[in-house]
Each structure stands twice: as C-alpha cells, then as structure tokens.
C-alpha cells in the first residue's frame, strides 16, 4: 500500500475540517436614522476562544476598524467616533457575532466584514 497517498488523503481531510468560515448576513437598505443588525456566523474554529472584530469599507475607501469583543464579552472596544452608534455582541452558544447599528446615516454605506 502507498503510505504517501494515505498521508495525503488524511492531510487533505484534516484541512477541510479546519477551514475557517465567517458568513455575514442581515445587511440591506435602511432609512436615515434607522437601525440594522448584522450577524456573522462562524465555523471551522473554536469561536468561544477568540477575540472577534468588525471592519467596514466604504465605496472607494480603505478598511475602517469598527471594534472588537473578547471571548467572554467582558471587554468591547470601539473606534471612538462609532461607539455611540454601534453595539458589538456575541453568542458563543450559536458561534455568532453581531453588530447592532443605530442612527444610520448615508456615510455608513459600506461593506461590513467580521474578522477573527
């Protein structure tokens, strides 16, 4: 039997199991002054052990860090200009990160990403 081939298959399967996935949802159109809650479903890693962040990218601009939350939600840090508008939370039982947006304005138009 070719042990090199067996090792390759095992390594390949292990790689598939360790694939990190972050899937954002909840975006859409909202009226000025309105609110919106984004979700980020995580898989492929132990979500409850990691700090998680939200970042955004407005059209034609670079990435802007919104904030981060520690594994047990006891520490949450925000970009100062956004801390009164956005609330970051998480549910470790559901492997999900949240971004509650309020007082939304046109300058909040962006692609929003969660990050580990």
UniProtKB/Swiss-Prot annotation:
Signal sequence coordinates: 1-18
Entry keyword set: Adaptive immunity, Immunity, Immunoglobulin, Signal
Domain Ig-like: 19-116
Top-level taxon: Eukaryota
SMART domains hit by this protein: IGv
InterPro entries in alphabetical order: Ig-like_dom (IPR007110), Ig-like_dom_sf (IPR036179), Ig-like_fold (IPR013783), Ig_V-set (IPR013106), IgHV (IPR050199)
GO biological process: adaptive immune response
GO terms under cellular component: extracellular region; immunoglobulin complex
The protein's name: Ig heavy chain V region 441
């Amino acid at each position: 039997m070719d042990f090199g081939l067996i090792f390759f298959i095992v390594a390949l399967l292990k790689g598939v199991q360790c694939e990190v996935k972050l899937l954002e949802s909840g975006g859409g159109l909202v009226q000025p002054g309105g609110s919106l809650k984004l979700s980020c479903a995580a898989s492929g890693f132990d979500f409850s052990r990691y700090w998680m962040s939200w970042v955004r990218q407005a059209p034609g601009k670079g990435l802007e860090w919104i904030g981060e939350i520690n594994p047990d939600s006891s520490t949450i840090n925000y970009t100062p200009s956004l801390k009164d508008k956005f609330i970051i939370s998480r549910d470790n039982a559901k492997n999900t990160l949240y971004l509650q947006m309020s007082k939304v304005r046109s300058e909040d138009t962006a692609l929003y990403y969660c990050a580990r």
